[in-house]
């Protein structure tokens, strides 16, 4: 206790010297109390739903396994990159795309590209997705369920440099949200009797701040009329008024990527296009919102 008090005196002095005392006293300390409350309460989860989901995943995994073995013409260890490489590049004669120190790569990028040539790589990707959900979320979450049916993770407000919260044991901030199986995992989290689970989120808060700080009239105008900024950006990127859900998702990636300085290469990887197309998208974005570009330079 004595040593802690000595360390504390030095830290408090530094906080004041760095003009951080106000943030510490009025933001970090109140937040720590909220997080302590969250950790103490935890979240209720249905073990029965998890186990039912596990059985459903097992059945689907077995079906995918059979399809893979039929396509490959042989049985092999699906979790062995070396055996998979042998099947893809020697047995099926598919072209190797990337080489590592241990041999030809069978990572997501390679399998996605090879899926254009043969149905087997797509099935491997599907198998991996379901296997991860089963092992990481279904089996992983069960280990943390306490006697009262709740999971109590640990939240940290000082781990990330950006100020975002981190969560571990388990990481409940990383529960999948998209796709049929991701939604089924989320459905395992339940409310106590007499309560409901509700979700609140700031509406495009980062882009609103960008509109305010950059002063870009076009971006501000979208928010002034309560428009859908991702839809408006998509119209600019694709040069048309009728926008699909997939095109809106691309625009969303561009909108948030621009804030953090995404490169043509980074954007091309994120949305699955070539670098020239990504570069043209960034160019069109800045033509629509010119003050965003000027603001980023400042």
Residue locations for each model-derived region?
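Conserved "right-hand" nucleotidyltransferase catalytic core of DNA-directed polymerases
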Residues: 1-180, 196, 203-206, 264, ...
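A short, structure-level motif marking secondary-structure boundaries and short turns
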Residues: 19-20, 50, 215-217, 248-250
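Function-dense linear segments that define catalytic or interfacial modules
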Residues: 1, 157-242
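Substrate-binding beta-hairpin/strand module that engages nucleic acids
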Residues: 25, 230, 245
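Short, amphipathic alpha-helical "recognition" segments used to contact nucleic acids or chromatin
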Residues: 250-260
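Positions in alpha-helical segments
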Residues: 109, 232, 252-253, 265
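Short, leucine-enriched amphipathic alpha-helices that occur as contiguous helical runs
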Residues: 28-31, 247-252
């Amino acid at each position: 206790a004595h040593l802690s008090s000595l360390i504390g005196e030095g830290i408090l002095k530094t906080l004041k010297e760095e003009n951080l005392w106000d943030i510490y006293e009025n933001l970090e300390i109140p937040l720590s109390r909220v997080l302590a409350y969250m950790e103490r309460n935890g979240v209720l989860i249905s073990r029965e739903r998890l186990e039912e989901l596990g059985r459903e995943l097992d059945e689907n995994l077995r079906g995918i396994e059979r399809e893979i073995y039929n396509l490959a013409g042989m049985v092999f260890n699906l979790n062995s990159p070396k055996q998979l490489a042998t099947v893809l590049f020697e047995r099926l004669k598919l072209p190797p795309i990337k080489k590592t120190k241990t041999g030809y790569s069978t990572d997501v990028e390679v399998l996605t590209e090879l899926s254009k040539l043969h149905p087997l790589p797509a099935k491997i990707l599907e198998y991996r997705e379901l296997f991860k959900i089963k092992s990481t979320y279904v089996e992983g979450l069960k280990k943390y369920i306490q006697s009262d049916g709740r999971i109590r993770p640990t939240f940290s407000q000082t781990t990330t440099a950006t100020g975002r919260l981190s969560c571990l044991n388990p990481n409940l901030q990383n529960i999948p949200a998209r796709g049929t199986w991701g939604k089924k995992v989320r459905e395992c989290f339940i409310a106590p009797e007499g309560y409901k689970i509700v979700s609140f989120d700031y509406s495009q808060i980062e882009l609103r701040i960008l509109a305010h700080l950059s002063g870009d009239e076009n971006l501000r105008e979208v928010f002034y009329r309560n428009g859908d900024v991702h839809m408006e950006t998509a119209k600019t990127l694709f040069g048309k008024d009728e926008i699909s859900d997939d095109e809106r998702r691309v625009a969303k990636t561009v909108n948030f990527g621009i804030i953090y300085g995404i490169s043509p290469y980074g954007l091309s990887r994120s949305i699955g296009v070539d670098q020239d197309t990504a570069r043209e998208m960034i160019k069109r974005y800045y033509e629509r919102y010119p003050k965003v570009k000027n603001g980023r330079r400042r």
